[in-house]
Every structure is written in C-alpha cells, then in structure tokens.
Design a protein with these regions (language model features):
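Active-site neighborhoods and metal-handling regions in enzymes and metal-associated proteins
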Residues: 4-289
C-alpha cells in the first residue's frame, strides 16, 4: 500500500493563484492572446518550471519515492519564489504530477519506490508574477527496455512535430494531425481524452489543443496566443481507466504511456518556447538519449 503525506506548506510571501485557498479555479474568462507584459512574465515562470524539472530529473534514480521527488520539486519551486500550480488545484494534494509506467497522467506522488527499468513522467507547473509555466518530461529510471525507449523517443519527437506546425495563421488541427501521423507511423496510439490547453494567468484556459486530427479544431492561431502541447502516447491501445482517487489515469491494457510538454507563445513566423531555462536549456532536449 502506498502512503501519501499531507500537502506541503508555501511561505506566505509567495504570491498564490486565486484557487490556492478554495481549490476552485472558476470558469475560464480571460482572453486567449497575451499582452507583452504577460509574455515577459511567462518567460520567467517557464524558466522556473524548466529549472525545477532539470533539478528533479537529476534525482530520478531507482529506489527514490515519487513523494521524495515531489518534495524536491516543491522545495525548489518555493526557493525560486514561485507557487506550485497543481497544489490544491481542484483539490490536487501534491505539488507535481508523477506518472509511472502505465499511468498516463495526473499520478499523485506517494511512497512508491521507483524500480530499475521504470519510466516516469514528471509534470511541473509554477505560478509566478501572475502567470503559469507548464512543462513535463518522461525520464528513464536506470536501464529500460527497447520498447520503452522507443515509446519515450517517439513521444518526444511527436511533441516537436506538433510544435513545428505552430505559427500565426495556422490552425489548431494542424498540431494534432502532425502528432497523430508520427505516432501511428511508429505503431503507437494517441490519448484523446487529455489534450493541450491555453495557459497564462489561468492554469487551464479555454483554448483546446487535441493531439490527434480533429477537423472541428479550426481555431486559427494568432500572434500572442499561449498554450501547451503535451502529447500522451501509448505502447498499446488508447482506452483509459481512472482510479478511485479521481486523478490517476492509467491505460486499460496496462501497457506503458509517455508524455512530453512545453508551453508556447505564437509568434508571427513560428513560436517561442516559454519553458526553457534563463540560459536557454530545454529539459526535453537536455535529457534526450
């Protein structure tokens, strides 16, 4: 049986998102296009999220618990003056999500020890200067099998295939089309129930980014829009099951799942990655192997 510790504290001097006390983010009501000041703050929030993900990733080793990884992330987030966005978002009890092997997303850190050969996605989001920065990487734990390496590598590539379609005037459906094509050509399935989303002053804003081709997703991307792309690909089928904790989502067939994520802002001729460190290091590339 895995044990979950209680929520971690955040110093009172750190600015909290509106939902921090109640857990209720309310409806998404803000514009999809960011101001120049908001984009400047998103660079800072994204840089913190990337720094934290790099720091946590260096601690992914056999024997460590996912709760310890959560503690490492939490301590680094607050040290850098930010708030861990998942904490109490709709009641989520931890500061990051840790999704191991067949867990697709929203795994809750607990006393589970990582084993040699596991894979783990760590999803870090921070709130800083009134905006969120959201990013994730799937890590190898020790030596993993070739099927898992294939899954992780193709999922990383699929993220970048989707990103490469982003520019002013392109359509949301172009992102999913590119991701789905790359996944299927490499014999992987695409999760449909969980998608990318608008992000900025709100953790999840109204813009929806499917990771599969959806001809209804005709929204035209406009300079200044900010959102995540975060494909989840599976070795087996794409049917899912949610645990009784109402957060943890797993593959129905028990096969492994991987995910990578960046926060982007649309530019006139492409995009800018928000979730890179102040020195330009991008976690999804730093840990590529």
């Amino acid at each position: 049986m895995c044990i979950r510790d209680s929520k971690r504290g955040v110093p009172s001097v750190i600015t909290r998102p509106p939902y921090a006390q109640t857990g209720d983010p309310g409806p998404s009501i803000l514009p999809l296009v960011r101001t120049s000041d908001e984009i400047a703050s998103m660079r800072k929030a994204g840089a913190i999220a990337a720094e934290v993900l790099l720091h946590v990733g260096e601690n992914v080793t056999p024997g460590i618990t996912t709760d310890k990884l959560d503690q490492i992330a939490h301590d680094e987030i607050v040290r850098l003056g930010a708030y861990p966005s998942p904490l109490n978002y709709r009641g989520f009890p931890k500061s990051v999500c840790t999704s191991v092997n067949e867990v697709v997303c929203h795994g809750i850190p607990d006393s589970r020890q990582l084993q040699d050969g596991d894979i783990i996605n760590i999803d870090v989001t921070v709130y800083f200067e009134g905006v969120h920065g959201d990013t994730s990487v799937t890590f190898y734990v020790g030596e993993v099998d070739e099927h898992s390496k294939h899954l992780v590598q193709i999922t990383r590539e699929a993220l970048y295939k989707g990103m490469d379609t982003v520019k002013n005037g392109s359509r949301v459906c172009d992102i999913g089309k590119a991701i789905e094509k790359h996944a299927h050509s490499n014999q992987l399935s695409v999760v449909r129930e969980f998608i990318g989303h608008g992000v900025g002053p709100e953790f999840h804003s109204a813009l929806a980014i499917p990771h599969y081709f959806d001809r209804r997703a005709t929204t035209e991307l406009t300079t200044g829009m900010s959102f995540t792309i975060e494909p989840m690909l599976n070795l087996g089928g794409n049917t899912l099951h949610m645990w009784d904790d109402t957060w943890t989502v797993v593959t129905t067939d028990g096969r492994r799942s991987a995910q990578f994520e960046h926060t982007l802002v649309v530019t006139e001729d492409g995009f800018e990655i928000m979730t890179k460190t102040s020195s330009g290091t991008i976690p999804s590339e730093y840990f590529a192997n």
